[in-house]
């Protein structure tokens, strides 16, 4: 999977995490160590965007959700991407100042919308509005917006989000023969024209609400009261600078649906199984699951891909070892045994071209071979007749 990430040309990637217990790390089960290292373990997923020409999903087993553990898993991205789309977890802040320095962080706008939706539907306002006529609703909004009522302000914000996502849907699909760069430029122009004014209006409402709903401590906003409205305002104010990156880059999505969908099978497995016993088990799971999910994203048969890759890898190791045996007097007497020794396979495959078996490369090659076979069969048909 590292080869897939290293060879993916995408400059904007998505990340998400989900809990997955490892008993060995929690000091429980038959594999428990002498000391517990963490009471909560995680799986971190990194994926390409939904419209990427090089879709993939990569999992990493984490001892904890600390910035150090996440940073170790994401170190591979340093210097490879421009923007990472994540949630509002504070650990990502230190990463962008450290190991991922130079990479921009876009917080999911869809998460901000969820916070506002939860706050808007937690009271009786929606129920009361449904009992009013359209004219009475307009008057209700006009009066309460002037008074700065939180519930009405949040409904206005929710309407703004609906506009933003509606505008985004208008340019979501690329045009025929449109390049990725041209599509991103068209999206950016659309956002600057239509989305930015709405976003700025939403930001102005939150800035005003923050005066009564939050307090600032050491650069972070905290809720004054334990209410859904205060939580929504706090989330926006703390992530404010990282929610608007998409306004300057048409490649950056507003959501992370791809990685959330890809991580769902892991969550289902956790619900049914509960945990893995050992660290090795967690690493194996993190290695196998993304192979299947990446194959699904690329529309290919993972078994066929792995068979082709395994045959090519073994052939490479076999030919390399026998060539060494023929050309070196110090070679072992039985080179075949060394080929079958897994301890030496990594060395034998050190110069194997894994890039030929990237899902999108392998798929393109298979499609080209199928077209060639069809053309040859078409040419041979008249001769056989």
Features from the language model and the residues they span:
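Catalytic center-proximal scaffold of phosphoryl-transfer enzymes
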Residues: 1-385
């Amino acid at each position: 999977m590292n080869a897939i990430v290293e060879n993916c040309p995408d400059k904007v990637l998505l990340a998400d995490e989900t809990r997955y217990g490892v008993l060995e790390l929690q000091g429980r089960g038959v594999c428990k160590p002498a000391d517990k290292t963490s009471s909560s373990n995680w799986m971190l997923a990194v994926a390409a965007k939904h419209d990427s020409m090089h879709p993939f999903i990569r999992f990493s087993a984490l001892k904890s959700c600390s910035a150090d553990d996440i940073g170790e898993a994401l170190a591979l991205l340093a210097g490879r991407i421009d923007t990472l789309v994540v949630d509002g977890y504070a650990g990502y802040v230190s990463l962008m100042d450290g190991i991922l320095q130079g990479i921009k962080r876009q917080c999911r706008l869809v998460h901000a919308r969820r916070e506002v939706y939860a706050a808007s539907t937690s009271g009786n306002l929606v129920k009361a509005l449904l009992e009013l006529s359209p004219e009475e609703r307009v008057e209700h909004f006009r009066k309460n917006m002037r008074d700065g009522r939180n519930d009405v302000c949040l409904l206005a914000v929710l309407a703004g989000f609906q506009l933003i996502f509606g505008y985004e849907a208008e340019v979501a699909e690329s045009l025929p023969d449109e390049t990725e760069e041209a599509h991103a430029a068209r999206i950016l122009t659309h956002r600057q024209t239509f989305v930015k004014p709405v976003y700025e209006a939403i930001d102005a409402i939150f800035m005003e609400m923050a005066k009564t709903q939050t307090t600032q401590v050491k650069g972070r906003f905290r809720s004054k009261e334990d209410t859904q409205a205060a939580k929504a305002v706090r989330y926006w104010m703390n992530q404010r600078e990282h929610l608007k990156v998409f306004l300057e880059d048409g490649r950056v999505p507003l959501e992370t649906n791809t990685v959330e969908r890809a991580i769902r099978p892991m969550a289902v497995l956790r619900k049914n199984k509960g945990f893995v016993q050992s660290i090795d088990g967690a690493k194996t799971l993190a290695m196998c699951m993304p192979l299947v999910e990446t194959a699904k994203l690329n529309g290919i048969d993972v078994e066929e891909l792995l068979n082709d890759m395994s045959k090519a890898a073994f052939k490479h190791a076999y030919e390399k070892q026998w060539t060494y045996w023929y050309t070196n007097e110090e070679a072992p007497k039985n080179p075949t045994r060394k080929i079958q020794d897994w301890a030496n396979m990594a060395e034998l495959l050190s110069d194997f071209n894994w890039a030929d078996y990237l899902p999108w490369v392998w798929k393109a090659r298979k499609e080209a071979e199928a077209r060639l076979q069809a053309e040859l069969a078409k040419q041979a048909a008249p001769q056989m007749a």
